[in-house]
Amino acid sequence: MCAAAVALLVVGCTAQPTTGGTSPGAAASRTSAFNATDTAWILLMIPMAERARQLTDLAPSRSADPAVATLASKAGSTLREDLRRLRAALKLSGVPDTRPHEGHNMPGMVGLDTLDKAAAAKGRPFDRILTDALRAHFTQSRMLCAGEQNQGRADEATGLAAAIAKSTSRQISGLDTLRAARPATPGNHKTTVKPDGPHRTATTR
């Protein structure tokens, strides 16, 4: 499953390296360690991380839960570092960033519609959007990293995939713990809101 997912990316995302002012021999030496899986993986992980980072950036002004805001802040910092390392690896490969997934909603990627909904939400609705979207992002990211480790060749790429996978597993664990501690309906109480003239009265049973 993991290898197949990355293999599909290879078909549509492989790009030819550009040499610029570098001699053909030097360029070939620099890029020979990177195979199609390496570059396809990097070209997908960059926009995935960018979208997730955009979502976490909304948390300080929209989250109602300090724990969710803290989780988003930590995730955002990690994503920024991941992006720095991914862009460095892409530069090392010699493959240009052609943005093959620009505007796409790939599996696990935070969708443009999700970003719009998150930007319009506040409080608990925002927290739910953020935690659901981050869970999907982390899960897909970990799967793609496993595929890269199995099928990639360049040490720079496979090593980065291993590091991101390890970090993502920790974030999934932290997110799941947070979600489990905050069920939609706490305890066994159920609150019903009933209209009462111009006012509303909440009853708990």
Segments (PLM) and residue ranges:
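Sec-dependent N-terminal signal peptides
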Residues: 1-6
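C-terminal motif of bacterial Sec signal peptides marking the signal peptidase cleavage site
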Residues: 9-12
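All-alpha RGS (Regulator of G-protein Signaling) helical domain and cognate RGS-like helical scaffolds
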Residues: 14-205
